[in-house]
């Protein structure tokens, strides 16, 4: 299996800081941390964007902001704002998604990422042929079914 690319939105980056007493949140956190280990171990290439950077920049919690910024250093590429990104985001917004969510998706599509990871239910309902959208747990199931290994 060739190296694949992954894009995580800010909901995913912040998941480990959410209330872990809730089962869904705890499972998604464990899966998200596993995805991070795949990136750190160079099994997946991380792509992020100016939207990730912006949302993290305005995060009022310094400890979260710092941890997420540190992980961005693992990225192979950062998608910057462009006419095409804005235009695609406008199309996505017409399908009912919020502007920042649409920008995340548009950036991922622009970078031709293989996998978009989110814990946002509205994004998970969005359908496109341009990339695969997963929550962290479903991504791990998919990754393993495709022969992905962490060793």
What is the predicted role of each segment?
Residues 1-5, 19-29, 109-151:
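Acidic, PIN/NYN-like endoribonuclease modules and their adjacent C-terminal/linker elements
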Residues 4, 14-16, 44, 67-74, ...:
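HAD-like aspartate-dependent phosphatase fold
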Residues 7-60:
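PIN/NYN-family metal-dependent endoribonuclease catalytic core
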Residues 12, 43-52, 58-60, 64-71, ...:
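Anionic, Ser/Thr-rich low-complexity intrinsically disordered regions
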Residues 32-37, 68-69, 105:
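Short amphipathic alpha-helical segments and helix-helix/interface helices
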Residues 35, 76-77:
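Extended, non-catalytic scaffold segments that flank or surround catalytic motifs
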